[in-house]
A protein has these predicted regions:
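Strand-loop microenvironment adjacent to phosphate/nucleotide-handling motifs in alpha/beta enzyme folds
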Residues: 3-191
Length: 191
């Protein structure tokens, strides 16, 4: 496992990870699916109107990966400070831009969650806020004691403002802003 590589004296390779939710418009995501349904003059299929998801654009995701590689010392998980959207706002944004052929609520599929969690309640104990990211540290890694963390990451703060980082608890991207993001992207171009 990765824990076998924790001792920097034995292994020079540093592993870090990123978590960032849904990349807006990526393959298999809801926006291209909804656009296709509208272009085919079909009802939009919605699992649950209250469903929320974190959202990041492709450029934001790429910038975040590079920033995480720059910040990382080894074994951290980096999570961006991002907002979320409701599935209803995505649907309403697209129907206002394109057309409205109705909707059909199909229910949540087995294993699907109503809200997305990027830092769970267990991980919060080992999580920090650093500049514009959250950082989950590995409690087994010797360099992640509070003194060394303070020295390595100037201005870092223990993350204690919520019990978990979940898409239902963060600020939402409003419909007008979603429309602007969608219109400025390449998502509406015919393939």
């Amino acid at each position: 496992t990765a824990n076998n590589y924790l001792d920097p004296k034995k292994h020079a390779t540093k592993f870090i990870a990123v978590r960032y939710g849904n990349v807006l418009g990526s393959s298999g995501s809801v926006v291209p699916k909804f656009i296709e349904q509208i272009k085919n003059k079909k009802k939009i299929t919605i699992t649950d109107k209250q469903m929320t998801r974190f959202s990041i654009t492709m450029n934001e995701a790429l910038d975040f990966i590079l920033k995480s590689a720059e910040y990382g010392q080894g074994s951290e998980i980096f999570v961006p400070k991002i907002r979320a959207y409701t599935i209803s706002d995505i649907k309403n944004s697209l129907t206002e831009i394109l057309a409205d052929y109705g909707e059909e609520e199909i229910g949540i599929r087995p294993g699907e969650k109503l809200h997305e969690t990027l830092i769970n309640s267990e991980e919060i104990r080992y999580s920090w806020e650093y500049q514009d990211v959250y950082m989950i540290t590995n409690p087994l890694y010797p360099m992640f004691n509070p003194t060394i963390i303070d020295e390595t990451y100037p201005g870092i703060k223990k993350l204690d403002k919520f019990e978990q980082y979940s898409s239902d608890l963060v600020d939402k991207i409003q419909k007008n802003e979603l429309k602007k993001i969608i219109e400025e992207s390449d998502l509406l171009k015919t393939k």
